């Protein structure tokens, strides 16, 4: 499946919630009516079946983190094979992706932009260049912007945006050096309450 490059508002309307795919502090423009489904007429949503609700939750999480279908299924299988709650394990695997950590540290204004920074070899982990967005960052790893990219305007602007929206507690960042430490894997209580991972577990358990 190809990566979606169309309007971000359309995805937000499809899922009925802000997916934080836009770069501004206010992610979705006021003209984007997320209460209405995509399309010219923007019909209101009717009652969904249990399966439909579960599927929409999976699609929402997949789009938030910018993960393709096959990748997401792989993460679920890995999460199910770990000790503990499968849903929490799944979210933690997604949070530990390098592109997501770069976003959480504020080096990219969106996860898509952060993924591009990684792919373009602008990011290092523990001093070594890593260009794989799905690379799993571990607690204690040092993630930094490489010297060649430190003066990019988009990185400076992204750090300013992050300062406005606030940075998560499980990363520590030196904005001058453009380097940060991934202090720990976040607990479920640290992550968004707008995600209902139990619906995803129910979907894959069928």
Swiss-Prot record:
Belongs to the universal ribosomal protein uS4 family. GO terms for biological process: ribosomal small subunit biogenesis; translation. The keyword DNA-binding does not apply. Residues 96-156 form the S4 RNA-binding domain. The gene is rpsD. GO terms for molecular function: rRNA binding; structural constituent of ribosome. Pfam families: Ribosomal_S4, S4. Keywords: Ribonucleoprotein, Ribosomal protein, RNA-binding, rRNA-binding. It comes from Pseudomonas syringae pv. tomato (strain ATCC BAA-871 / DC3000). Part of the 30S ribosomal subunit. Contacts protein S5. The interaction surface between S4 and S5 is involved in control of translational fidelity. SUPFAM superfamilies: Alpha-L RNA-binding motif. SMART domains: Ribosomal_S4 (SM01390), S4 (SM00363). The keyword Repeat does not apply. This is Small ribosomal subunit protein uS4. It comes from the Bacteria. One of the primary rRNA binding proteins, it binds directly to 16S rRNA where it nucleates assembly of the body of the 30S subunit. With S5 and S12 plays an important role in translational accuracy.
């Amino acid at each position: 499946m190809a990566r979606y490059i169309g309007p971000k508002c359309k995805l937000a309307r499809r899922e009925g919630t802000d997916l934080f795919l836009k770069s501004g502090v206010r992610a979705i423009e006021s003209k984007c009516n997320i209460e209405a489904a995509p399309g010219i007429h923007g019909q209101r949503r009717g009652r969904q079946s249990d399966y439909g609700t579960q599927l929409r939750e999976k699609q929402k999480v997949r789009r938030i983190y910018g993960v393709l279908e096959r990748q997401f299924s792989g993460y679920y299988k890995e999460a199910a094979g770990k000790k503990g709650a499968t849903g929490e394990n799944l979210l933690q695997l997604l949070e530990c992706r390098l592109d997501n950590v770069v976003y959480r540290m504020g080096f990219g204004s969106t996860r898509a932009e952060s993924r591009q920074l990684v792919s373009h070899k602008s990011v290092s982990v523990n001093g070594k260049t890593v260009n794989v967005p799905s690379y799993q960052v571990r607690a204690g790893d040092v993630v930094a912007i490489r010297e060649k990219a430190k003066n990019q305007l988009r990185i400076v602007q992204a750090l300013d945006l992050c300062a406005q929206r606030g940075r998560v507690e499980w990363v520590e960042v030196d904005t001058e050096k453009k380097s940060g430490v991934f202090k720990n894997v976040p607990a479920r209580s640290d992550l968004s309450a707008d995600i209902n991972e139990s619906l995803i577990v129910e979907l894959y358990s069928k």
